[in-house]
């Protein structure tokens, strides 16, 4: 099954990523079923979430639902099987030289894909994405021959990448599209009204290479759900507490500038964020994080799912899209990851020096790395 405009990820609900309250097992499963019942037909999971538990939970939630009635997207790439963590950085990428040589890439990918499918309780993905690649994962021919073998074995119909978890990687993503053109079908990127940068640099290359984009975190840390206001108290351990001070206040001020456009169409702020994002070149699906905020005034997570499922078929005008982009412009607000000019030294799993190959990518696509991919100001 092909991608649908709206998608649901197993990181929603706070059990596997620390955003808001962690739902009970019963409510977590019910939310997935509720998403399906309301019309959401793309579901995404990653094997690294609680060492495969998210896969299992998704399989339980979808049990009994006809397999051909939804699009299933898997994500693999962090090697959870030896259980070797790199401290706070989490599990190593499967391409890490400390784990294996390139001639073992294909066997690892086959094993990881099969184990994920087994946990979900099905025999195939509609799409399988490479999770948070390092520089090897983006560019290594042997790694992508291993990915291609999964398609040949009919374990998946399509292939792609899911960069992250932080923002950046623009030139690496484009290089991957070009180097493996015809093999990379889909990619999940960070893109939304509050974060048009740097993801927008990827859009023309995606269109040229026929890559369909899935935009994550369009909700911008939950702000577009409209129940995170100035003075909001986050729960202990919530990932959002690590964001720069004042981000809630600054984000809400921008949302209020965008609100008249949502009011014109009678839509919610989440729906506005999704419609703006879907108006961007090559973006075919949006997958916000659904969060059950703590506190008495929070909106029920089920209501947030309803808003996504009810996304109307509205086309914002070009002027409205530009107004939203201008309000949310975040260029230069952070240090990016991936290949970028601010990094020097030995390559790390999530950032590396700007190579001559990446410089050439930048030149082909009109990107000046030192102007367009560097930190300039706080958000």
Q: Would you name each region that the model predicts?
A:
Residues 17, 89-192:
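Glycine/proline-rich, positively charged
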Residues 22, 83-92, 227-235:
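Short, flexible, mixed-charge acidic loops at enzyme active sites
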Residues 3-7, 41-42, 69-73, 124-129, ...:
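Structural preference for beta-strand elements that scaffold enzyme active sites
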Residues 11-13, 48, 75-79, 130-135, ...:
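Active-site beta-loop-alpha junctions enriched in small/polar residues
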Residues 41, 204-379:
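Structured C-terminal cap/extension of enzyme domains
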Residues 2-3, 37, 61-67, 71, ...:
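Acidic (Asp/Glu)-rich catalytic clusters
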């Amino acid at each position: 099954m092909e991608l649908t405009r709206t998608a649901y990820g197993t990181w929603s609900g706070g059990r596997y990523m620390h955003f808001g309250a962690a739902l009970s097992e019963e409510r977590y499963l019910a939310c997935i079923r509720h998403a399906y019942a309301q019309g959401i037909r793309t579901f995404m999971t990653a094997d690294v979430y609680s060492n495969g538990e998210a896969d299992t939970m998704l399989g339980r939630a979808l049990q009994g639902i006809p397999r051909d009635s939804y699009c299933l997207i898997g994500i693999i790439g962090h090697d959870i099987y030896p259980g070797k963590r790199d401290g706070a950085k989490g599990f190593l990428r499967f391409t890490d030289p400390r784990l294996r040589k390139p001639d073992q890439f294909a066997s690892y990918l086959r094993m990881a894909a099969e184990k994920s499918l087994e946990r979900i309780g099905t025999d195939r993905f509609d799409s399988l994405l490479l999770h948070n690649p390092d520089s090897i994962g983006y560019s290594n021919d042997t790694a992508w021959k291993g990915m291609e073998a999964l398609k040949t074995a009919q374990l998946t119909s399509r292939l792609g990448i899911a960069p992250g978890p932080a923002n950046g990687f623009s030139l690496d993503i484009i290089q991957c599209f070009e180097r493996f053109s015809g093999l990379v079908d889909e990619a999940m990127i960070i893109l939304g009204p509050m974060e048009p940068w740097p993801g927008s640099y990827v859009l023309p290359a995606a269109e040229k290479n026929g890559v369909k984009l899935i935009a994550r975190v369009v909700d911008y840390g939950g702000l577009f759900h409209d129940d995170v206001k100035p003075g909001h108290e986050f729960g202990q351990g919530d990932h959002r507490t690590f964001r720069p001070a004042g981000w809630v206040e600054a984000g809400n001020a921008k949302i209020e500038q965008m609100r008249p456009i949502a009011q014109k169409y009678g839509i919610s702020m989440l729906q506005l964020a999704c419609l703006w994002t879907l108006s961007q070149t090559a973006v075919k699906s949006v997958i916000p994080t659904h969060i059950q905020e703590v506190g008495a005034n929070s909106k029920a997570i089920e209501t947030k799912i309803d808003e996504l499922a009810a996304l109307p078929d509205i086309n914002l005008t070009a002027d409205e899209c530009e107004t939203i982009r201008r309000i949310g412009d975040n260029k230069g607000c952070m240090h990016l990851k991936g290949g970028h000019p601010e990094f020097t030294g030995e390559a790390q799993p999530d950032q590396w020096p700007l190579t001559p190959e990446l410089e050439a990518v930048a030149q082909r696509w009109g990107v000046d790395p030192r102007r367009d991919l560097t930190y300039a100001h706080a958000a």
